[in-house]
Amino acid sequence: MPTAYCLLVLMINVALVEPEIPPNTGNVARLCAANRVPLHIVGATGFRLDDRAVRRAGLDYWPEVLLHRHPDLDSLYSALPEARFVYLSTKAERLYSDWLFEHSDCLVFGRETRGLPEHVLRANWDRCLTIPMLHPNVRSLNLATAVGIALYEALRQTGVFKAMSQ
C-alpha cells in the first residue's frame, strides 16, 4: 500500500465542498498546512487555484498544503475508503464537543452561503455536528473559524498534540 494512502487513512482530513470565498479557502489551507492535515476541495470553486493565482495571492505556504481535488463527493468518498466522514453544519443538533473524534475522520464543510446540500445532511444525520453560538441573530461562524474549531478539537482528542510534546 502506498505511503501517501496510509497517511491519508491514519490522519484527520478536511474537505471543503464548493468553497466560494478565496480568503476563507486560503485560511483553511494555511491551517491544514500548519498541522500537516490533507485538504480536499470538492466540486467547483468560486475562484482559481492554479499556480499563477496562488503566486499572485502571495500564499507562500501553498507548497506545504497537502491538496487534493475531487469533482464531487463520490470521488472524495472513493479517495478515502477507510475514512469516517463527519459533516459540520449550522443545521445539525449534535455539538462537535460531544463527538468522539477518530484518526480516520474527514471533517466535511459546505459552501459559505448555503452549507452542505440538504440530501447529504439527511443521509448522514448521525454524523452531523454543529458548533454552538450564544447569539441567535448571528447566522453562522466564518468557514475558516469553524474549520479551526473543529479541526483543533479533533487533533486534541486524537492525541496529536500530546504525542508531539513527548
Question: Could you say what each language-model-derived stretch is?
Answer:
Residues 2-166:
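Post-transcriptional modification and biogenesis factors for structured RNAs
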